[in-house]
Amino acid sequence: MVAELTALRDQIDEVDKALLNLLAKRLELVAEVGEVKSRFGLPIYVPEREASMLASRRAEAEALGVPPDLIEDVLRRVMRESYSSENDKGFKTLCPALRPVVIVGGGGQMGRLFEKMLTLSGYQVRILEQHDWDRAADIVADAGMVIVSVPIHVTEQVIGKLPPLPKDCILVDLASVKNGPLQAMLVAHDGPVLGLHPMFGPDSGSLAKQVVVWCDGRKPEAYQWFLEQIQVWGARLHRISAVEHDQNMAFIQALRHFATFAYGLHLAEENVQLEQLLALSSPIYRLELAMVGRLFAQDPQLYADIIMSSERNLALIKRYYKRFGEAIELLEQGDKQAFIDSFRKVEHWFGDYAQRFQSESRVLLRQANDNRH
């Protein structure tokens, strides 16, 4: 029996080696694709191509008796690696005549990411940090674009301190709140103004499939090329007004981050044994705990800035607190029917999204379980 099992395992090892060789060949082809895309200014991520390819592979897998979900899982992981490696080939310069780009706060993580992407795209990039401020006027004197990438709590102050910029210079900010910084830029500069909010962390590795929100400030025709450049990097653009942006971010960022903070604080105050929680946890709780722990591995100043960026955020969090209390009252009253009625009400509000999110989360939970040791 042992000899038979060993022989089968040896065959599996040989198949795995063949898979490795095929993956290496695929990455070589991806590198060639990256060179072609760079030369012609084509975006890294093309949704239609990816969807078509996955649909074809799923059908072919089913015909071979291979679970379609398996090949999709494998290919999605391979494609993520492919998108990352395509970065190394650089990108076409969509605005060759652009004068130097100055990134204010370019030493920070997001600033460094934009410096990398702009440099890979053939633009000259300068960094303006706090210790360079006495030379700021010289550094921005011939700038074609100035990107402000500083902590939220000093963004408007830094914008207000900028020396006069060339009239055709594009002024951009990357803050997580948009209305205040956008208004500050419109006051500080008479030329083109653009508000950006990258909806991802600087450790993403690739901009493929990442969302970049943009808010028009002034003269969109002057910065249209930059939006197209960001699309070439693989990102998806979403336009919204600065006011609507901040209203949505109250839910997406402020409330979510605060709830995560409060849960982490509760765990710490209860002094639970994390090792035991992890050993006993289901995949969904492990994933939730990972998201909580991830928050506390990052800069507390950033999250304080996001959560406390407006009175609107505080009002929303207070409403959440009130509803939390109302839900606790159901428990205190032991009113299961009222709980079920509330549950059904929310279920109805989610509509088809409930089933969609269940399917999406099922994939995430399988991946989380795969990573368990």
Question: Which residues are covered by each model-predicted region?
Answer:
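Rossmann-fold NAD(P) dinucleotide-binding segment
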Residues: 137-185
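Active-site-proximal catalytic alpha-helix in oxidoreductases
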Residues: 210, 224, 245-271, 278-297
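Extended, charge-rich alpha-helical interface modules
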Residues: 1-102, 116
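Adenosine-cofactor binding site in Rossmann-like domains, unifying the SAM/SAH pocket
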Residues: 125-138
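Rossmann-fold dinucleotide-binding core
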Residues: 178-181, 185-236, 240, 249
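Hydrophobic Val/Ile/Leu positions in short beta-strands of Rossmann-like dinucleotide-binding domains
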Residues: 103-104, 148, 214
